[in-house]
Regions:
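Beta-strand-rich domains and repeat architectures in extracellular enzymes and scaffolds
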Residues: 33-104, 142-143
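Short loop/turn segments immediately following the C-termini of beta-strands
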Residues: 95-97, 157, 221-225, 233, ...
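Beta-propeller blade signature
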Residues: 103-113, 169-183, 231-234, 402-418
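Short loop/turn segments immediately following beta-strands, especially the blade-tip
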Residues: 108-115, 180, 233-239, 298-310, ...
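Blade-level signature of beta-propeller repeat domains, shared across WD40, Kelch, NHL, RCC1
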Residues: 293, 377-440
Length: 440
């Protein structure tokens, strides 16, 4: 301090830096947004939201306490599994695997919540999240999709519980919301022949063709019934596709995640991602069973034709394996043909540029963190950002979560920065189609 008295410019600079440090520190603690230095990629992961356990935006604290006393809300029983982003809404889904889940489809306002652990607001309202209210309420929702026509595609599987405790309270029903009005514009109940006694549908992909908003198809993966249900918006009709590639790999049922060794040998088709439109006017659906380390693909030209889809075994393509730590949950592909896929064995997200052959040498890890990313359950690309939901699902299901620790996170990373310097970075070629690149 004595020395600095004779150097006023140095002293001023020091004070400036010190005050800046205090402002940054204070801002971080107020906002609740923390950066996680990723082990891979130039851009750090940003922890946008985090929770020890989930909470809901009741009208007042008295209502919340009444719900807790009645057992309608049990904070430790909520596990978030799916996310979606539309404008200033961040949607979060929570299946009713246990008692005390007040709402299965929820959102966070990105306008009013800049970080921290915000309470979830039921979407579109409390009344339409009533369990067992078939036709008027949502019972259990897993993953969802918002399309460019401002529609939110929501499959209500109608179940309460999980595994041996499952009760089919309502039929499988596809609900499509107009996000500009928060009203359901289409409600479709799956046909009995679309499902079987083992059906478990936890994912949906939505395909928009050249014909605009009416040229829409939804693909729903039946993870335990080993099928794919296709729904046509224009025809207002559904059909089921079966193929042996939807089944699990018997050699890929062993998992080591979050310090737990367990076996999920029955897990079939789960993750799905759609390519950009190819020159033939169709997309490619990439998919993988959860208990597998391999990717598969089929043209949507096959899936969108009910008759053709029943007899096109050889139209389905087998791609190489991702490697020994290649279990993957959700995946998504952006408009340039880059696929992003959650690698649950590695607490990471990987990438593949589909203009290159599908092989480990053409894949990279772009986000990884051994604390923040235990079991990445969902992934989306929106507005130039990669959004990742992590939820420690195996610990929740097979052990006990520590509710003094952060268990659930929503993380983001800028796509361009995440891909920079990797084999997935943009190539000078234009996306045309995938078949030629698979065969190279």
């Amino acid at each position: 301090l004595l020395t600095m008295k004779f150097f006023p410019k140095v002293r001023a600079s020091f004070l400036c830096l010190f005050l800046t440090f205090l402002l940054i520190l204070n801002g971080s603690s107020v906002s609740g947004i923390h950066g996680w230095g990723s082990n891979f990629g130039r851009a750090p992961l940003l922890e946008r939201f985090f929770w020890r356990n989930m909470d809901f935006a009741y009208p007042d604290e008295a209502s919340r306490q009444v719900a807790i006393v009645k057992g309608e809300f049990i904070p430790e029983n909520s596990l978030p599994v799916g996310i979606e982003v539309w404008r200033t809404k961040l949607f979060v889904t929570i299946p009713r695997w246990r008692d005390g889940i007040p709402a299965t489809l929820n959102y966070i306002s990105l306008d009013t919540n800049r970080g921290g652990s915000p309470k979830l607001t039921p979407y579109p309202n409390w009344a339409q999240n009533k369990a067992g209210a078939c036709g008027s309420g949502l019972t259990t929702v897993y993953r969802i999709h918002a399309d460019v026509c401002d529609r939110l595609w929501v499959l209500d599987v109608g179940t309460i519980g999980i595994g041996n405790t499952t009760v089919q309270a309502c039929p499988y029903t596809l609900n499509v919301f107009d996000l500009t009005t928060d009203k359901i514009v289409r409600q479709y109940t799956l046909r009995p022949e679309d499902t079987n006694q083992n059906t478990f549908i936890a994912n949906i992909a939505v395909d928009l063709g050249k014909g605009g908003c009416d040229d829409a198809y939804a693909y729903m993966s039946d993870e335990l019934g080993y099928g794919l249900i296709v729904y046509s918006w224009e025809q207002n009709k559904s059909w089921r596709v079966t193929h042996s590639y939807f089944m699990p790999d018997p050699l890929a049922g062993d998992y080591n995640i979050g310090g737990i060794n367990y076996q999920w040998g029955e897990e079939g088709i789960f993750g799905m991602s759609l390519s950009p439109l190819a020159v033939d006017g169709h997309r490619t659906l990439f998919f993988h069973p959860l208990s597998s380390r391999r990717e598969f693909a089929v043209s949507t030209r096959i899936l969108k034709d009910e008759q053709l889809s029943q007899d096109s075994y050889h139209e389905f393509q087998v791609l190489p394996e991702r490697g020994p730590l290649g279990h993957s949950t959700a995946s998504v592909m952006d408009d340039s043909g880059v696929q992003y896929f959650n690698l649950i064995d590695q607490n990471a997200v990987g990438c593949w540029n589909s203009l290159l052959p599908y092989a480990p040498i053409n894949q990279a890890i772009i986000a990884k963190h051994d604390e923040a990313m235990i079991f990445p359950a969902d992934v989306k690309v929106r507005r130039g950002l990669l959004w990742i939901m992590t939820d420690r699902m195996p610990v929740f299901l097979l052990s006990t979560l520590n509710y003094t620790d952060v268990n659930f996170r929503i993380l983001t990373v800028p796509v361009q920065e995440a891909l920079a310097g990797t084999v997935c970075e943009a190539t000078p070629w234009r996306y045309v189609g995938n078949r030629v690149w698979w065969d190279r």
